[in-house]
Structure formats: C-alpha cells, structure tokens
Curated annotation (Swiss-Prot):
This is SAC3 family protein 2. PROSITE patterns: PCI (PS50250). Signal peptide: none annotated. The keyword Transcription does not apply. The keyword Lipid metabolism does not apply. One of its GO terms (biological process) is mRNA export from nucleus. Residues 1-16 have a biased composition (Basic residues). Keywords: Cytoplasm, Nucleus.
Amino acid sequence: MSTKVKQKQKQKHRPKPSLDRSDSTKRAARAARFSTTLDANFQALKKKRKDEQESFQAKQSTNWEKSSVLVGTCRQMCPEFELEERKLQHAIHPYELDPVSKQAHPSLAVKAYHRPAAGKGPILPSDVRPPSILKNTIDYLFKVILDRYSLREAHAFVRDRTRAVRQDFSVQSSFSQDSVYCHELIARFHIISLHELAHTPNFSRQQEIEQLSKSMEILYTLGQLYDYMHLRKEHCTHEAEFRAYMVLLSLGDPSVGLDTLSWPDFVFKKPIVKTSLKLYSLAQRNNHTITTSNSISLSLVSSFNTEATSNLYTRFFKIASSFRVSYLMGCLLDLFVPSIRTGALKAMKKCYLSAHSNIPFKDLMKILAATSEDELVQCCKMHGLKIEYIGEQPSAVVLNRKTVITEPLLSSEISCRFADEKKPGTNVSDLICLDTDGSSLHRKKPKLFKKRSIVRQR
C-alpha cells in the first residue's frame, strides 16, 4: 500500500474537532487550571508566604514552654492566599461569586475546611482568623446564607465552612465567649439538619451525629468550654440547653450519669435539663436483642440492657409529646423513638393473650405517639406485625404472646417525624440564632395526649 493511500485513510478515520462550545470551554478551563504560568498576584503571595513560613519557624523554640501561642491575623472571612489559590483551581463556590461580575469577591468568600497534610508546612497566623472574625463569619453563614437559601441547598457549604471555623478556634486554643457562641450555633445547625434532611439523598445522618458527639467534636468541645468558664466565674446563658442536648444524644449510653457529676448545681435546676434526664431514665429498657452484627450503629442505640428498668414507654411518650420538649429536643429524640417503640412493642407483647381482642389501631397510635397512620403502618410492617383493616382503614394490630416481632437492624430504616409536631412557624436561620434560652421558646401545644391515653381493657 502506497504512502499516500495510508495518509488518506488516517485522515478519513481521524475524528473531527468538536464544534460544541461547552467542550471548548472545558478544554480552555482545563488548560488554564493545569497551566504552568501562574497568576502574578498568586506568585507574589506565594513568595510572601514562603518568607512568612521561614520567619514563623524561626520564632518557634524546641522548648514548648517558650513557643509562642498562635494568634490569627486574618481580618477577612477567607485568607487572601487561599482565595487566590482557589481562583486558580476553579474551586470558588457559587455563593462566593459577585452577583454582577460573577467573579470571586473577598467579602463573600469563606475559608474552606482543609485537613492537615504533611508537606504543607506549619499553619501561619495569616491563615487563621481571630475569634472576633470567626464570630462574624458564623453570623454571615447562619444569618445571611441560611436566610437566603434553603437548608437543603446550603447545607454542604455551611457544614464545610463551619468545620473550618472550629478548626481555627482549635489551633488558637481559644476559650472565649466568642468560641462558646459559635459552637452553640453550629450545634443547633447540626441538630436541625439531623431532622430536616433525614430523608434527603446523599445526606449521611451518621456523619452528622459524629460531628456532634464524637471526641473533640462540637458538644464535647462545648462541655470543655463551659467547664473552663466555670473556673473563670463566667456565666454562659445557654449552658443548660446544650447540656440537655448532650443527655438526649446519649439515650443509649448507660454511662451518662457519670458525665453529669461534674455539672454545676444551677444546671440541674433548669427545667430543660430535668426533662432531658427524665427522658433518659424512661428510655432505658431491658429487652434489647443481644447481637454482634456490625451493621448496627451503636452510637445511636445501645445494645446493652438496663437492669431493673420498668420499660415505662407510655410515660416517655407522654413527656416527649408535651410542651416540655422543644423542637430541637424533638429533633434528637427522633433518632431514638424507633428503638423505644421497638422496646414498647416487645413489652406489650408479653402482656396480651391471643384470646383477647387485638389492639385498636388508634389506641396504639396514641401509645406510641405516632404522628400519622402511615407512620404507624410502616412501623408495624418493619416489625412484622399484622394489621387488620375495615375497608381501606386500619382498625387493629395483632399483638400478643404468640406474635413474632422482627426487630429492625437499623433504626434509620423506620421513618419518624416526631419533631414535626413541635416545629414552629419560623425559618431555620431564626431557629439557629436564638437570642434566649431555647428551653423557653418555640413551644407548641401538643396535639397528642390531650386526654389520658386509652389503655386496652382486658
């Protein structure tokens, strides 16, 4: 075959250049991103940063007692170097763009969270925002961003930026009222997200819980901050509220009583703390199914049985449905209500004989504080309980000693909208930025248990 024929065949099978503008734009953006020619401003900042690193390292002594405490010097919500770096990486979030020019704006950009990585050098004062700027950043995220966008839209952005705020407080070892203020608002954000986004695709409830409860995370840090404030004889207005959340997030932990021993007396006198401790005691049960399955999240529901407990589920649901429990408390209780309902059904099973009539569906709704018929139907199906119908309406539930109850492995499999009954008519931004004790605001008269619960007659 001649050379000319081969060249013609190559040209024939050669793909034609794409006329799609989007493709050309993507290629141009990719070329700009991986170009070796950096922006002049970024180059200047990079050189300045290198000099700052050398100066900072020279000041640090090998003796930790003489080492200087890191104090942030960044006066904006986002450090200048990070902003220029993210511009080159095309990592600017749409919320950080100027609405007119569509360019990154220094007053709209917020520092993103970065994991500490080897080879990046020490954290510099210019990378860290002081407490006053961190407080302004939190106000911007919760009072502006969450007021402008829905929680579903803004959750990922706010979650990432608040992690960066906590990181800046941590590297400065800041134990101040500004730190308390910021951590309290961040805690409310995660608590509300647990409930509001529970059924949103790609939302991880487990990750949200870890941000609240794991060692060195939000509620743990708040506990340390409160303890430090007590040593300084300073008062924290919302301490009782968040101590109550600590208890409610640990309903499945039998060691909560030990953690409360260090709390001051005035905290125990607050109604919100009394209510949370009462709910904790009533939530304990002794009919857990002992299992070694790794699929069960023990951070939510303990598999340990509590000795000498009376399985007082009716009292638990009466208190939980009352005005004594606020919306945010209800958001946390939603995590445990499915497990407590499982314990209630197992306890009721032992009390009723097959010779008796079946439990009326409406009565069981009141006993288990189900917010709708569909919720109770789903609960019964998840536990393998048979429901009797009159026409299309559920009339009774078959539950007696002969009934076999299937205990769901994951409580998240059961839909629970317990907190919806307590949700106030206000937006998420207002709920997060309460100016007074959350235990006394946003109470809604309960629809359930207006009358004494009907107990099945034998």
